[in-house]
A protein has these predicted regions:
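Short, charged recognition helix plus adjacent turn
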Residues: 61-79
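Conserved hydrophobic/aromatic packing and binding residues within compact polymer-binding modules
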Residues: 7, 21, 32-35
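The alpha-helix within a helix-turn-helix
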Residues: 11, 22, 52
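A short, Lys/Arg-rich alpha-helix, primarily the initiator
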Residues: 1-14
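Recognition helix of helix-turn-helix/homeodomain-like DNA-binding domains
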Residues: 26-43
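Short, charged amphipathic recognition helices of the HTH superfamily
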Residues: 14-19, 45-46
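DNA major-groove recognition helix of helix-turn-helix/homeodomain DNA-binding modules
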Residues: 44-62
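Residues within the helices of the helix-turn-helix
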Residues: 8, 19, 49
Length: 79
């Protein structure tokens, strides 16, 4: 699964709109939309840090980066 696809799954798992996620993380809404519409497939390191560093989304870091989940350590998958 591509990184941009994982980002959409995380947003959906949290029940957030694109705008809500962008407001929470500081990611530009048009940038986020370009990921979800697959116009932009490479996610910048800055955006990755905004997601993985946010308290609401830290639990997805291992899955986002390595396709692994360790629930006993608080690292889960949205699917």
């Amino acid at each position: 699964m591509e990184l941009f696809e994982k980002l959409k799954l995380i947003r959906q798992a949290e029940g957030l709109t694109q705008r809500e996620l962008c407001d929470a993380t500081g990611i530009n809404l048009s940038t986020w939309k370009s990921y979800e519409l697959q116009r932009r497939k490479e996610v910048s390191s800055l955006e990755l840090l905004k997601i993985t560093g946010h308290p609401q989304f830290k639990k997805y870091t291992l899955w986002l980066m390595c396709d692994e989940a360790v629930p006993e350590c608080g690292q889960i998958s949205p699917v």
